Amino acid sequence: MLKTTPLNAAHRAMNAKMVDFGGWDMPLHYGSQLDEHHSVRRDAGMFDVSHMLTVDIHGENVRQFLRGLVANNVDKLTLPGKALYTCMLTPTGGIIDDLIIYFLSESWFRLVVNAGTADKDIDWITGQSRQLAPALTITPRRDLAMIAVQGPNARTKVWNVIPDSQAISENLKPFQSVMLGDYFIARTGYTGEDGFEITLPAGQAADFWQKLHAAGVAPAGLGARDTLRLEAGMNLYGQDMDETVNPLESGLAWTVDLKSERDFTGKQTLLETPVNRQLVGLVLLDKGVLRNHQKVITRQEGEAGEGEITSGGFSPTLNQSIALARIPAGIAAGEQVHVVVRDKQLAAKVVKYPFVRNGQALV
């Protein structure tokens, strides 16, 4: 039996194409993935992300516990409502999950973790807590729903739906959040566009979804969510990284704090392990489509040097095929590589990602 979000009936009422997404019954699209993609880039779209899990951690020493749990430094979180993107690592540096941490008070931090890793994450966090901070209370919030409203007009349309929300959220910077009654409003997202991710009680989600739709926000499914995040150069857990790779070879060095004296799980391995691979962007120069797991040839014939596409597909905004690929370190942006597509080697250019940000092509 597939798990369902509080919006399942709403998706079906909108004639969504439903698919099994990691054990969840989720909308792939509502008729046109392409239209949904463009709605987010040009206006406003909304995604049901209630399958992701909010985890509240309460107690006296939450900050100290998180200092050792994650690779980024939670001491950056000084302003209530501020958010931090980070990874949890295994002792050998592999990525257990990527997540967002919100600082709400010294005794209350909120984590948002991926759906497919939620059970594993809870087991890991509670296991670490039992050892290091047994007095903490760890609460998975399955009573909450989450809706992401994204696009250049997303915030304005949310303000039109939630009374008094503009005054309290208009001055939020990216990666800041605020509570407004039952709404937890965060200026975050997974599309490369502006917008909010809004957490609210599950019982209120369907009504809020309908009000957003009435305000001109287009529903968007997992298909558009994937093409948008790929254009934005944002990693997808299970494709671009997992426990077999570390953040330094996954384009996530910026989320790892190795400079402070603070210790965290996996730090020693990261310090001792040479970084032989890197995650890069690819733009296909020949005709064809880049797909996950295609082999990337990074050297001339006879020399070592192979990589693999981790996420690939067609970019509706750029109207060409793009990919994220893990290749040997030392290959610079601007260099040409070849991707093995069936029995052919197609030329591609290495680029710095993101490919698109705030509706504008960057490559």
Curated annotation (Swiss-Prot):
Segments crossing the lipid bilayer: none
E.C. no: 2.1.2.10
GO molecular function: aminomethyltransferase activity; transaminase activity
UniProt xrefs under Gene3D superfamilies: Aminomethyltransferase beta-barrel domains, Aminomethyltransferase fragment, Probable tRNA modification gtpase trme, domain 1
Domain of life: Bacteria
GO biological process, alphabetically ordered: glycine decarboxylation via glycine cleavage system
Record keywords, A-Z: Aminotransferase, Transferase
Reaction equation(s) it catalyzes: N(6)-[(R)-S(8)-aminomethyldihydrolipoyl]-L-lysyl-[protein] + (6S)-5,6,7,8-tetrahydrofolate = N(6)-[(R)-dihydrolipoyl]-L-lysyl-[protein] + (6R)-5,10-methylene-5,6,7,8-tetrahydrofolate + NH4(+)
GO cellular component: cytosol; glycine cleavage complex
Family under the similarity heading: Belongs to the GcvT family.
Alphabetical list of PANTHER family matching this protein: AMINOMETHYLTRANSFERASE, AMINOMETHYLTRANSFERASE, MITOCHONDRIAL
Function field: The glycine cleavage system catalyzes the degradation of glycine.
Oligomer and partners: The glycine cleavage system is composed of four proteins: P, T, L and H.
Name the UniProt record assigns to this protein: Aminomethyltransferase
Protein species of origin: Nitrosomonas europaea (strain ATCC 19718 / CIP 103999 / KCTC 2705 / NBRC 14298)
Gene name, Swiss-Prot/TrEMBL: gcvT
